[in-house]
A protein has these predicted regions:
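Short N-terminal mixed-charge amphipathic segments
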Residues: 1-46
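Non-catalytic, well-ordered alpha-helical scaffold segments
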Residues: 22, 51-55, 77-84
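Surface-exposed polar/charged interaction patches
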Residues: 27, 31-38, 60-63, 89, ...
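Short hydrophobic interaction/assembly module
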Residues: 43-72
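C-terminal charged interaction modules
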Residues: 64-107
Length: 107
């Protein structure tokens, strides 16, 4: 798989990697709740929210793939785009393994 000009191995058909992805998504949800609380606090600084958001994405990628796909990224919009491109690639893989099996394919 290649995302953000980084080539790495990730196969959603691997039970180990699928489990890592699910766990990373769970942890991301927890981090997002904390960020949302910070966003709602009028005393929070924008730089804190941006930093926490970048860290949330960075930790997600490291937990899910063991690779820091953000590298030197310091832009939340760019990080969000990288996240969605990764999910698009995972969806493509998932679609191929969840296709219905048919005996017509072997005959």
């Amino acid at each position: 798989m290649k995302v953000n000009n980084v080539e790495f191995e990730f196969n959603i058909s691997s039970l180990k990697q699928a489990s890592a992805l699910e766990l990373a998504l769970d942890h991301m949800g927890e981090r997002e709740k904390k960020i949302n609380k910070k966003k709602a606090d009028p005393n929070s600084r924008l730089t804190e929210v941006l930093s926490d958001t970048l860290d949330m994405f960075r930790q997600f990628f490291i937990e899910a793939t063991t690779v820091d796909l953000l590298q030197e990224c310091d832009d939340v919009r760019e990080a969000t785009g990288i996240y969605y491109r990764f999910l698009d690639e995972v969806k493509k893989q998932k679609d191929t393994i969840t296709e219905p099996y048919s005996t017509d394919r072997i005959l």
